[in-house]
Amino acid sequence: MAYEKNNGIVAVQPSGTSTWTKIPLKYIKVEEYKVTPDMMLDLDSYRQETGVLWRHVLDHKVTKIEFTTPHLYETDVTALLTIIQNGYTNTKSHRGKIRYYNPYTQSYKEATVYVPDIEFNINHIDEDKGTILYNPIRIAFIEY
């Protein structure tokens, strides 16, 4: 299966539902969208005194998805955060479920992820209009 417009590049499953809410591309700088699917995990890997690496690669693989938004006004930031936060099954740990397009398999996969802290940097405040414009924001989904 290839990329499907209706599924989007990444979607969030609202908590308690079986539906998906795709993250609209208007919130993603597509050229800065990064997916690292099926990353290997090591446990207690080490180098010998000769410099030879001994790896203990686990069977479990994880995916990391990162993207940057374009400059967004506060209303768009709120809309994007609502999509993401509606997917939290645990608000304390920012845990939720996503569906994403995996380039390795050319198919969609589901993952239980957490969203690391998000940093907001203001570009401009228009006091007359009462608007805030934010610089690009980095969003990440990291699989458990």
Regions found by a protein language model. Give the residues of each.
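Extracellular/virion structural assembly segments
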Residues: M1-Y144
